[in-house]
Amino acid sequence: MKLDFHTHGKLAKRLPFSTVYTDWLFGEAKNAGLDALCLTEHFNTLQFDELYGYLSTRSTREGDALVLENGLRVFPGMETDIAEGGHILSIGPLEAILELNQRLAPHKAPGNFLPFAQLRDLFDQYPVVVGGAHPYREGGHIPQLPREQLARLDFLDLNGKDLATNRQQAEQRT
């Protein structure tokens, strides 16, 4: 299975949700040969619920996946900022992601982000896998987290954007 673990369904988190863009994006993903993707939209994006509501109406449910008309499997997820600096991915059942997003409402603005340990404690209450998003990108501090906290991650995301913009640096850091 060809799977992208870190995909956004919106062009930018401050822009309104666009069904046209999202449909185009998922069509391009399928045309590029992907079988599935994890939709890890920013937790504080505009219209987070609307994006997932739209996908729910345009897909059939198979386990935790939303299967689109073109056959692309979409695994619901979210990208969450942490107080230390950096982003954490969570992927799981749609209901879990939507509930987590609601529970994080008080922590969506800079200055209110949860520290990683508290965020992970929250995620531990749900059937989600949790990973560090693009940990070596400028401004992120995931590699500086204490070793016992790093051990709580299920995976690390090596983002293609990092390879495209500075492959040598990305390879050295990983």
Report the location of each language-model feature.
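An N-terminally biased module of ancient metal coordination in phosphate/nucleic-acid-related enzymes
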Residues: 1-82
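Small-side-chain structural scaffolding
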Residues: 17-18, 22, 29, 36-38, ...
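A generic local structural motif
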Residues: 23-25, 117, 141-145, 169-172
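N-terminal cationic-hydrophobic initiation segments that often serve targeting/anchoring roles
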Residues: 29, 120-124, 174
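Extended substrate/RNA-proximal surfaces in nucleic-acid metabolism proteins
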Residues: 47-157, 162
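Conserved beta-sheet core of the metallophosphoesterase superfamily
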Residues: 58, 161-174
